[in-house]
Amino acid sequence: MTAEETVNVKEVEIIKLILDFLNSKKLHISMLALEKESGVINGLFSDDMLFLRQLILDGQWDEVLQFIQPLECMEKFDKKRFRYIILKQKFLEALCVNNAMSAEDEPQHLEFTMQEAVQCLHALEEYCPSKDDYSKLCLLLTLPRLTNHAEFKDWNPSTARVHCFEEACVMVAEFIPADRKLSEAGFKASNNRLFQLVMKGLLYECCVEFCQSKATGEEITESEVLLGIDLLCGNGCDDLDLSLLSWLQNLPSSVFSCAFEQKMLNIHVDKLLKPTKAAYADLLTPLISKLSPYPSSPMRRPQSADAYMTRSLNPALDGLTCGLTSHDKRISDLGNKTSPMSHSFANFHYPGVQNLSRSLMLENTECHSIYEESPERDTPVDAQRPIGSEILGQSSVSEKEPANGAQNPGPAKQEKNELRDSTEQFQEYYRQRLRYQQHLEQKEQQRQIYQQMLLEGGVNQEDGPDQQQNLTEQFLNRSIQKLGELNIGMDGLGNEVSALNQQCNGSKGNGSNGSSVTSFTTPPQDSSQRLTHDASNIHTSTPRNPGSTNHIPFLEESPCGSQISSEHSVIKPPLGDSPGSLSRSKGEEDDKSKKQFVCINILEDTQAVRAVAFHPAGGLYAVGSNSKTLRVCAYPDVIDPSAHETPKQPVVRFKRNKHHKGSIYCVAWSPCGQLLATGSNDKYVKVLPFNAETCNATGPDLEFSMHDGTIRDLAFMEGPESGGAILISAGAGDCNIYTTDCQRGQGLHALSGHTGHILALYTWSGWMIASGSQDKTVRFWDLRVPSCVRVVGTTFHGTGSAVASVAVDPSGRLLATGQEDSSCMLYDIRGGRMVQSYHPHSSDVRSVRFSPGAHYLLTGSYDMKIKVTDLQGDLTKQLPIMVVGEHKDKVIQCRWHTQDLSFLSSSADRTVTLWTYNG
């Protein structure tokens, strides 16, 4: 033994010991909170098992049943038992919410929660092991509280969910085994190891003290050896060294052969007494928002509940491996509750600072109000807090004092006092809430009137310029008055209005108005601008032509922020879509759609063209084809649809023959535009350093061979640490998604979970990935974990279909999928539900993309057509669709330009076509 020895201790293992102890003592709220903060889980699970655990701990019961569907066809899997476990937990939680609502005297919500509980009970009937079990569950409906039943005396959602997972885990472990990649995560702490180590540590201190007393001649009797134990402070032997072990090693062997009397150690543990109030708060708070009957429902736990329990049991699937983050979920819940599904998801995404949309709120948990649309300052904001700030403060005091004060009355008296005190508060709240809802309805009517003015007020050519200017000024004055009512900052708006009036005056003398902030130009006689007013922006314009009322205009892309130029310039709406109207009748679709977009460039190849991608700057686009050829073409400097009666060949700036050994299936530019990645059925990913100015390669290719099948899609995102580009790639073969640090040339992660070939990828938010697969699912992945954080199936109606393309709108709230059954699905990411599934095409939808402002959805299909869907209306109802392009063979990919109203389409007819808006 050397003079110095080293013992390696991992903090992760210490946390696992603590987690095991908390689990053994049923302190599951604390256990899950520790998992959330540390990112450590006490267990050895596969990625799929971790995801199943996350779904159960989140209370996503429908998703759990959907996730487990592939196992239900196996004979060995006890489908009936598994469904019984899940549905029983769902029933108990619905019952728990019902009890909490009853205690708070909320009759409006009580009916809904009772209905939810009854529905769960009916679903349980066919899966119950016996009639007696079903009768016992029915009996629970008659109890005032679930905890009044002896079996559920100590029941709480956190513990119940953990136990539910443990039971489910035993059933599915055989089918979802831990995989070899997780073996380094360490072993699971068990058998109350922390308690054992504490006791052994105490005994070690006693031994050290006893040996020291023998060495110094101090007399300590055998009965006194254990009397000096102090678990919290120790006995003074705090030095961590090997002196005792070294001393024992120097003792002669004969010492250890001496006979001794074996003694037993009796350990008496004073059990922890949990506060009864904490347990009740756990029942009250985490489940109510989960069962909200509609998005605008004001059911939210009171802020004062944070004094008793700060952890939400319904967190977002956006965070740590264990899925316990509550911050983003709280934001998501708020967003869902303030916007009915009839509002366009695009309306949420306004990049400007000022935002007048009543459905958009401050997404900050520290802000407890939205932009109030009423000059009445005492009106409570129901979307953010169910009671006014004064009432909220009173509620906080009334609940915190009994929990913490020394002069607490009995529990029954406390509850009666709280209920009596809260009755008046809730009555006042409902009165104020009714006033506020009426006020919102009035404001919504005004907003619709303003929008009607926008659509009708500036399109009649027969009105003289003076009348048009008067209309503009009248609308501006009304809008300014409206802004004042809404208490929104008006800094600098006066200058903008002056500039608008000057521009209106200037437009009298000449008809030359710019129509683009980039190179998009039109002749003076055809130029136009539209009067537009969205939530936080005002523009003015002159009409286009007498027939423009039947024309489908694309207006500004970003409805926020002033786009006013200098005094010598005209108002230039940013190229892209806007809150303009794309609505039209079905009969007009085929007749007028060809006029909306015209073909200006066609690139021909010898074989089918699969992949296209615009450079981030918009001046170039890459094309990859089955002929193994990679091209980079120039985007036209000037876009003039009238000058392109006959489509021209684009200028090819860069070309490389046989770039791959096989067909090029996908191409992608890095965010900085300096890397061009391609994927092929030769199973290689190539990354080409590229200079956009010289249009040439700037270094040797990077080649990655981690895939064992065709690479079907690629995507880039910025690296959070190195700042370099992170390449995301996926395809056939092992069905994994691979992430690669291109700056270092190193692989980062292999994300497994899909059971079919991955056909599509999409990235957003700097760390989120969406993937579509032939296994008929879309998976969301969080690279901060990294693991799958949500699975979205396509079996909402029917048997589902392979997902060929995925896209997420710029706000990160709406997912669009293109599927092989000719359907498109719109999915509310934050709400966790499907908004609509519709069939815009008659064959496979191979490409879907949101316009940069998310007002329109571009789709390409094997039916040879390219269509645009208007997303500005009620997303739950039939959406306006128009044909904007057509090929002679299957359409494979479509991509919007980064700035202009243009898009690329690639096809099996061996062409790539550039289409632009025929403005």
From Swiss-Prot:
* Location relative to the cell: Cytoplasm, Cytoskeleton
**At which residues is Phosphoserine found?**
S289, S292, S297, S312, S422
Top-level division of the source organism's lineage: Eukaryota
Query: Could you tell me where the Polar residues compositional bias lies?
Result: 517-551
Q: Where are the WD repeats?
A: 604-643, 659-698, 706-748, 753-791, 798-837, 840-879, 886-918
Q: Which Pfam families match?
A: LisH_TPL, WD40
Protein's UniProt name: WD repeat-containing protein 47
Q: Which organism is it from?
A: Homo sapiens (Human)
